[in-house]
Amino acid sequence: MPEIVDHAGDVDDLPAFWRRADSANPDVAPILWLHGVPTSSDDWIPFLQKAGGIAPDLPGFGRSAKRGDLSYDIDFYCQWISDFLDRISVDKVRLAVHDWGGLGVAWALRNPQRVEKLVIMDAVPFLPGYKWHRMAKIWRTPFLGEFAMGLTSKRTLRLISRESNATPGPLPKELIDDAMSHFDLGTQRAILRLYRSSPSKVLAQTGKDVGNITCPTLVLWGEKDPYIPARFADAYAEAIPNATAERIADAGHWPWLDKPEVIGRVCDFLTS
């Protein structure tokens, strides 16, 4: 099992935190794991333990910078990903994204020469036809979003998370504890700015050239994802020339929590 080492440093004058583990296959480009909302690189620990790679806390999340003067929009994150990889002297990657880690798809469109393989899991779709889920609509609404953020606690997150996965009950205590341990005003601000800068038309416009992604791509989706319907797995597979879609029965938004074998499927694809 690869040893996971924590790192901290500045990326373009912004403090950043990331985890890194030696690859199970050192002859290929490292895997870059990009997490979603409202979590951190902690999501990827079981993947790092199996396949190695690099998992940053994106700005606004976890232990990375949460400055108030940042835009936290798609352009900002795409530039940050490039700056981060340059900072750690990594040129090409094999990329895995989940939820808002799907910003990596937007980055891949701008940097196709840097991506050798791609896994998309239950990610925000840069495709036509997506309508934001109920919680996102609240966050996108001024004042109401701030009010909802102020009410968020471990208890409310446990209640909300009951719809997130197919297994009865809330998300695992460890995931909720991790999310809430970093859910300060800086993270709340980043989430609100990210959602408010990303109406459906911006998502579709961002991904209008998604067919230009030509690397081997695996699209995995929990069949019971309540936030992003599984039909977007098929939509991504139709739009990306070298992509295959697999719907995961009895799995929700974090499919590997309902079906741990997803971890092996993802790691095998990325390391082969």
Predicted regions and their residues:
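The conserved beta1-alpha1 loop
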Residues: L32-G36, H98, W221
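Active-site loop/oxyanion-hole signature of alpha/beta-hydrolase fold enzymes
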Residues: A55-V97
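Flexible "cap/lid" loop of the alpha/beta hydrolase fold
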Residues: K117-F147
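Short beta-strand/loop motif that positions the catalytic acidic residue
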Residues: I213, V219-W221
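Acidic catalytic loop of the alpha/beta-hydrolase fold
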Residues: K224-I228
